[in-house]
């Protein structure tokens, strides 16, 4: 029987690479040999640290990967052995010490079992798309979906507060639509990355007055503001950056706990607000992969760390202990 290796996290945040048997495929399933799986530091560690509830521990996280189809059941349609695919979910069942492992999305694994007729988020990787870069497709797709939902137009002044991978994805999507882009962060690495990929204005919130900088660019305030930090205390400062009858987007994930902000600011500004969720499904994923392949979305620059699967537990431990302040994006090579 074939075996698989998967990155496992326990409730006390211990990380290990463990081995699991791969059962015989059903007629509608295919087996994918993982090439690369992308790390989502924001969402995955919100789950690992209990900010988001994705079910019980132990858990195999990861929700984006690229690999090659190595076997396909007789009823699989649209895929065959040798195809390269990108995907969001792994349905391989895992047992650990007699207990079921919560695979949540489970793509941090050397193989994936997928029923393409039932699974959301699997598609053929187009020719010319780099596998390593493409394994980080979800975060920019989340940003693209948010920009599409907010209706960003040519000439709009767009602010993103918090330039993690999702926030940067939103900024680049807005820029490709012809918007004037302003990125706000406190991380020197993120600020430099934003400059290198063409963000129009970069604001260091640790040393500059954010409101003054934004008003110098857009005296009446920004047309569209995306709050991407996911930190509730940052909502009020971000709301102040909007113009009258502008648009405000809750781009960050604020977790299970209730949040609050001062009502009279968005009320007085008569803001339109949006709460995007997920990656925009197939249309956004397709667009992101295509733009990566063409070079219009220079996403390889966002990947600062690439590790072998055997090094993944150490990487996750270091991230959990906040030992990698310059980490931008990370990929596991299987």
What are these regions (language model features)?
Residues 1-2, 236-239, 282-334:
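C-terminal hydrophobic helical "lid"/dimerization subdomain
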Residues 23-39, 49-91, 126:
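Glycine-rich beta-strand-centered segment in the early N-terminal region that forms part
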Residues 36, 64, 83-84, 111, ...:
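Residue-level marker of beta-strand positions
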Residues 88-161:
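NAD(P)H dinucleotide-binding glycine-rich loop of Rossmann-like/cofactor-binding domains
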Residues 108, 186-193, 257-263:
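Short, glycine/polar-rich helix-capping loops at beta-to-alpha or helix-loop-helix junctions
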Residues 130-208, 212-213:
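Mid-domain Rossmann-like dinucleotide-binding core that forms the NAD(H)/NADP(H) cofactor-binding site
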Residues 150, 200-272, 325:
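Glycine-rich cofactor phosphate-binding loops and adjacent beta1-alpha1 units
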Residues 211, 215, 219, 256-305, ...:
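C-terminal substrate-binding/catalytic core of Rossmann-like NAD(P)-dependent dehydrogenases/reductases
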């Amino acid at each position: 029987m074939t075996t698989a290796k998967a990155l496992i996290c326990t409730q006390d945040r211990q990380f290990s690479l463990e081995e699991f048997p791969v059962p015989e495929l059903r007629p509608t399933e295919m087996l994918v040999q993982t090439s690369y799986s992308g790390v989502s530091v924001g969402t995955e560690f919100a789950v690992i640290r209990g900010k988001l509830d994705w079910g019980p521990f132990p858990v195999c996280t990861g929700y984006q990967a690229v690999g090659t189809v190595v076997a396909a059941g007789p009823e699989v349609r649209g895929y065959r052995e040798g195809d390269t695919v990108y995907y969001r979910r792994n349905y391989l069942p895992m047992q650990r010490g007699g207990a079921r492992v919560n695979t949540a999305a489970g793509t941090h694994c050397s193989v994936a079992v997928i029923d393409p007729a039932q699974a959301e988020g699997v598609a053929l990787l187009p020719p010319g798309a780099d596998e390593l870069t493409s394994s980080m497709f979800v975060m920019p797709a989340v940003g693209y979906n948010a920009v599409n939902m907010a209706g960003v137009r040519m000439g709009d002044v767009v602010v993103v507060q918090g330039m993690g991978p999702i926030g940067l994805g939103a900024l680049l999507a807005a820029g490709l639509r012809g918007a004037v882009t302003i990125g706000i962060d406190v991380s020197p690495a993120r600020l430099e990355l934003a400059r290198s990929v063409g963000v129009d204005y970069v604001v260091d919130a640790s040393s500059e007055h954010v409101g003054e900088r934004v008003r110098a660019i857009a005296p009446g305030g920004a047309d569209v503001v995306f709050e991407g930090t996911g930190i509730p205390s940052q909502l009020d400062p971000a709301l102040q950056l909007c113009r009258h009858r502008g648009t405000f987007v809750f781009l960050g994930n604020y977790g299970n706990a209730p949040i609050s902000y001062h009502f009279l600011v968005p009320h007085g500004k008569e803001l339109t607000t949006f709460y995007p969720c997920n990656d925009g499904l197939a249309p956004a994923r397709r667009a992101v992969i295509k733009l990566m392949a063409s070079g219009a979305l220079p996403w390889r620059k966002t990947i600062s760390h690439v590790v072998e699967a055997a090094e993944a537990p150490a990487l996750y431990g270091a991230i959990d202990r906040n030992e990698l302040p310059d980490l931008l994006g990370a990929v596991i090579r299987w």
